[in-house]
């Protein structure tokens, strides 16, 4: 009979080996997807975890995009950052300039996982790539463009063709007046006013938002959205607001709820709002392209993306990064990227996901579901319509919101408000430029 202490030692060793064999690498993933979108994020994570028992993706909703970005950077400074942080597109320059990130192409390379960067739609991947090397710094995830949602039932009641949404902003103003006259509470409201009414208005109508090709060619860019075309557009919305044909309902996505609960007959909002509209709208609705300015030469041009990408944070161990690479690879697989696109309304981020969705007949069964993609690919992007890469852009958006609100409340003229927004925004750009050179 073996001595008892040998048996106990063997038992302890066995338990330790079992523990190691069953060890699971936990990978925190902080995001800003709520409602139906949050459910889809959870579903993707659960499926990955089931297929990869050595890893556990733990998605956590950390508030809206601004709140999540702030929480992620603050957590990095205290050594408690998540492995994956979802950051909205205007936070790209900030993340690039920070020392908090590990480029995704490095993550894949070190994990020994083949990663084809060319699989992503160029208009999307170009937004998140290093302008010097061309390599992806973050992985595209929930990319979107603004679209026009409209209530077909309300259109019929107002004597409008439910299959013909307004094509121009001038048409939209006319439609909204008719909808109001028919008894609808709100003819038109807009979500994300800075992104839609200035950033995308500029690109869609072939206008620069800032110099240096919207910042892609250097941090010394200056804002240029106070030109006559943009001022005229804001003045049109101001006039609609005075008549009650445009309702300002908030800075974020508040207009989506106003739309699906039947208060507003039309809204311009993210294509990613489709999941919630599909779930909650109790009426027939349509999806149209963003209106363009009837007076703009060669409009419409191409939409620029919104949404967010996934950034990998510094300071994690090798096993965590291997799990991160596996998860990002999982998200990019055609069947997963196509499902995310189809269920949420976000763009198909890879060519294969778009092809698979088309082959499955999804667009035929769901008219309008490809609207965001068609807008993005409407024309080859001009150097100043491929996106924005401006430092401190989240803070600049706040300034734009404040100044536009001063128009809606009658405190400033459109020219005064946009001039002030440009002046205040340029101060932030110079501050960012200085910080990148120090």
UniProtKB/Swiss-Prot annotation:
Q: What is the lineage of its organism?
A: Bacteria, Pseudomonadati, Pseudomonadota, Gammaproteobacteria, Enterobacterales
What the protein does comes down to:
Part of the ABC transporter complex UgpBAEC involved in sn-glycerol-3-phosphate (G3P) import. Binds G3P.
Q: Source organism's superkingdom?
A: Bacteria
Q: What is its main location?
A: periplasm
Location relative to the cell: Periplasm
Q: What is this protein called?
A: sn-glycerol-3-phosphate-binding periplasmic protein UgpB
UniProt: sn-glycerol 3-phosphate binding residues: 65, 89, 144, 270, 307, 346, 397
Subunit annotation: The complex is composed of two ATP-binding proteins (UgpC), two transmembrane proteins (UgpA and UgpE) and a solute-binding protein (UgpB).
Q: Which UniProt keywords apply?
A: Periplasm, Signal, Transport
One CC-aspect GO term: outer membrane-bounded periplasmic space
What protein family does this chain belong to? Answer: Belongs to the bacterial solute-binding protein 1 family.
| One Gene Ontology biological process | transmembrane transport
Signal peptide residues are 1-23
